[in-house]
Amino acid sequence: VTSLDHPLADQLTVSFADIDGQDFVLSADDFDYETGKLFRLNHITPNVRFRINEDYTAIKMVEQGFGITVLPKLLLHNIPFNVCVRSFTEHFRRNLAVAYLDTPGLSPALDKFLTFVTKWAKECKLI
C-alpha cells in the first residue's frame, strides 16, 4: 500500500526488490510474523519509521506519505482511504485456518460460518 503520489503507485505490480530500503509504516506485531517473514525470506531491509498497533492507522499514515505498508488483500477491500494498493510481482500467500471443537449443537452462527467458508474454499479451488 502506497500513497497516491509515491513512485511505486505508477507500477502495475511491485517486486520485493522495489520495496527494499523503502520507508515503512508497519503494525507492531505483524513485523514479527507475516511481514517480517516475507522480508527475511526475500532479504528485504525495510526502513521502519513507525510501528502502529492498528492497521487502519497505518493506512492513514501511508495516505499522508509517512511510508508504505504491506497488508493482507482481504483487509484492503473497499477501504475508505485514498491510497494505492498494488500486488506483489512474486507469488506470496498466507494460510488461514478455522479451528473449533466438533461438538454436538454448534451455534447457528458457527454452523453458517463453516458452511460459508467451505463453499467459498471449494469455489476458489482451495479444497
Language model features with spans:
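Acidic, Gly/Pro-rich loop/turn segments at junctions of secondary structure
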Residues: V1-G21, K73-P80
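Short beta-strand-to-loop elements that line the ligand-binding cleft
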Residues: L26, T45-E54
